[in-house]
Curated annotation (Swiss-Prot):
Family of the protein in this entry: Belongs to the protein kinase superfamily. CMGC Ser/Thr protein kinase family. MAP kinase subfamily.
Descriptive protein name: Mitogen-activated protein kinase 13
PTM (free text): Dually phosphorylated on Thr-175 and Tyr-177, which activates the enzyme.
Modified residues (Phosphotyrosine): 177
Residues that bear Phosphothreonine: 175
Annotated catalysed reactions: L-seryl-[protein] + ATP = O-phospho-L-seryl-[protein] + ADP + H(+); L-threonyl-[protein] + ATP = O-phospho-L-threonyl-[protein] + ADP + H(+)
Amino acid sequence: MEFFTEYGEASQYQIQEVVGKGSYGVVAAAVDTHTGERVAIKKINDVFEHVSDAIRILREIKVLRLLRHPDIVVIKHIMLPPTRREFRDIYVVFELMESDLHQVIEANHDLSPEHHRFFLYQLLCALKYIHSANVFHRDLKPKNILANSDCKLKICDFGLARVAFNDSPSTIFWTDYVATRWYRAPELCGSFFSKYTPAIDIWSIGCIFAEILTGRPLFPGRNVVHQLDLITDLLGTPSSETLSRIRNENARGYLTGMQRKHPIPFSHKFHNADPLALRLLERLLAFDPKDRPTAEEALADPYFRGISKLSREPSRLPVSKFEFEFERRKLTKDDVREMIYREILEYHPQMLQEYIRGGEQISFLYPSGVDRFKRQFAHLEENYSRGERSTPLRRQHASLPRERVCSSVDSNNQDSDNEERRAISSIARTMISPPRSQEKGKNRASAYPNGIINLNSNPKIYLKSASISASTCIIRGNKGPKENGISEDMEEVVYELSDNVTRMLS
């Protein structure tokens, strides 16, 4: 059986193997035959089976089309469905990141102070940009932060994100909040206040940073009450002023009746941590949201002296209310299908113009691309379900894509000043898991995509990671026994990685 033999855009991608499987669909590693770049392709199955899930997909595609930043994961392409009104599956092509921050923390128990600082700096830069657009992420956690072995981080999974408008009723705005409890701000644990702010994301970043420092979740609550207990064990009981502003009577009563707790000095909790890091962490984890800094204020903290230059960190105008009018309406399945189709057309400019002019899709332009993918994914899934690592049958190419070696400096940050370059270089020199030999490093360097360091000209030591084998982020010669297969944890990591889509930076 041959693949990609008929006319269609799917022939641009050469599928390699399944790297993950989840409730939404299947993720496969692939090569873009036009550029030689490795990408991840996610097939989202039966998008419209549940309208709520379809709306989440629509929201994420739309939000991340509008948020274009070096520290946010990038979508490359979305394949055009064969029909406008009957399609069920979506194929999303996005940049292939090597791992996520959860795996990096688990695999690296001796991250340096330089790692700590650079990780937090990137997260706050992304958050500054996101919040400037009036977007709240609402589900920040280590598994929703992708990572490469050169310490590059990118925020992903905006399915729970919301855009804040001044005239939006807060009761409607927050009724579906279901983010991960461990990283949830205390005001969200008990519906403390009538209006929420970007401070909810700042709290999550604080929890993530604490986990980077210690290697363990800071507040692993079993339920909401236990979560509040853990928070107050560290921070102490909130002030009477804060308690008086809590609108939820049960939450206010519970905290008021709680035995008085005194805060634990962060220096006792986080041994050997940089005092400046702990001072900033205390600000990020203020119980009262009004006492937390904004992302921009946090970036101006003395902790980042030498690498931070606020004038260089991008912001953007608030997103248009028109883009998210659908959040205020009750949508049918057909409504969501049409809106998702419209978002897909953003990656097909010519078709978009025809759509805007009122013309129908010209189906013969792409008669079989998705059908080819369906057969190919079916082949891969069959082998995957048997626990086999499978490479699909495919045609032989007369000339394979050229190998590409990317610069050690992210192309999106080429205008960085010398101070930041020195900081990044210093961090890279401290990374863990060096290649076994210079010769092996030379052989592998050309295969690394997007932002991976060129070992030929700049040998550096990599972060360890328990990442998926298909990503080739880990030097293959150094694989441990856990990296030879795809564990359940890895399936979840890959699925969560693949569930996040953004528009390609122009």
